[in-house]
Amino acid sequence: MSEWLFDLGNSRFKYAPLHGNRAGQVQAWAHGAEAMDAAALAALPSGQIAHVASVAAPALTQRMIACLQERFTQVRIVRTAAECAGIRIAYADPSRFGVDRFLALLGARGDAPVLVAGVGTALTIDVLGADGLHHGGCIAASPTTMREALHARAVQLPASGGDYVELAIDTDDALTSGCDGAAVALIERSLQHAQRSLGAPVRLLVHGGGAPPLLPLLPGATFRAALVLDGLATWATAAASP
C-alpha cells in the first residue's frame, strides 16, 4: 500500500513516502501565503493514503487537501493529541499546541531527554523528558523573521546578507550577528534550564530551513532535516495500530 507524508509549513511544503516508521526521500517546495506553485502541484504523488500536517493559512491548507483528495484514496489530517506514541503534551488544551511542534516531539522521542529547536518562520523550542513528558517550551521570531521585521520598520536596514561575527564592523554583519545570536542565546538558555530542571544531560536537536546557519554556533547540536516528517511517520504508524 502506497502511503505518503505531507508537511505544509508557513513557507515551505515537504513530502516523502512512508518507509516503515520513517520518512523516505524528502522533496520540498517554497510556497506563498495563499498559493502553491503550479509545478509543485503537478509534481505531487498519488497513492492510497496521504497523511497531512499543516500550519499554513486555512485557505491554502484546504486547497492542498482538495488536491490530495483527487490523488489519494484516503487523506488523514493530523491533529495534536494529548498523548501519542509514548509522549504526553504539557498544554492543558492540546489543540492549541502547534501540530508541527507535536510531530517534532514524536520524531525526537528516541533521543529524549531532548530539547527540540525548530527554526523556520518562527523559532520554537520544546523540552521532552526521558519518560515522554513534554515540559513546555517557547516561541520567538526566527532570525529570518527578525531581519524581515527590521527591514519593514526601517527600510535602510537590508533584509538579508552578512556573516556572523562576535563584534561586527559593518551593518550587514551586525544584523546577521544580532539576529542569529539572539536565536542561539535563547536556545542555549533553554538548554541550560532544561538540564537543571531534569537533572540530566539533555540532547539538542535542531530542524527547519533556517537551522543550518546556526549550526556552527551550536557545536553540540544535531541537525535533523526531516524531523517533522519522521514524527508524522510515527503518528501514521500509531494511527494504524489496533
From Swiss-Prot:
Subunit structure: Homodimer.
Organism superkingdom: Bacteria
InterPro entries linked: ATPase_NBD, Type_III_PanK
Metabolic or biological pathway: Cofactor biosynthesis; coenzyme A biosynthesis; CoA from (R)-pantothenate: step 1/5
Organism: Xanthomonas oryzae pv. oryzae (strain KACC10331 / KXO85)
Catalytic activity of the protein: (R)-pantothenate + ATP = (R)-4'-phosphopantothenate + ADP + H(+)
Keyword Iron-sulfur appears in the UniProt entry: no
Protein name: Type III pantothenate kinase
Annotated substrate binding sites: 91, 98-101, 171
NCBIfam families in alphabetical order: baf (TIGR00671), PRK13327.1 (NF009864)
Family designation: Belongs to the type III pantothenate kinase family.
Annotated catalytic residues: 100
Gene designation: coaX
Cofactor: NH4(+); K(+)
GO terms (BP aspect): coenzyme A biosynthetic process
Gene3D superfamilies cross-referenced by the UniProt entry: 3.30.420.40
Residues reported in the UniProt entry to bind ATP: 7-14, 121
Cellular localization per UniProt: Cytoplasm
General function of this protein: Catalyzes the phosphorylation of pantothenate (Pan), the first step in CoA biosynthesis.
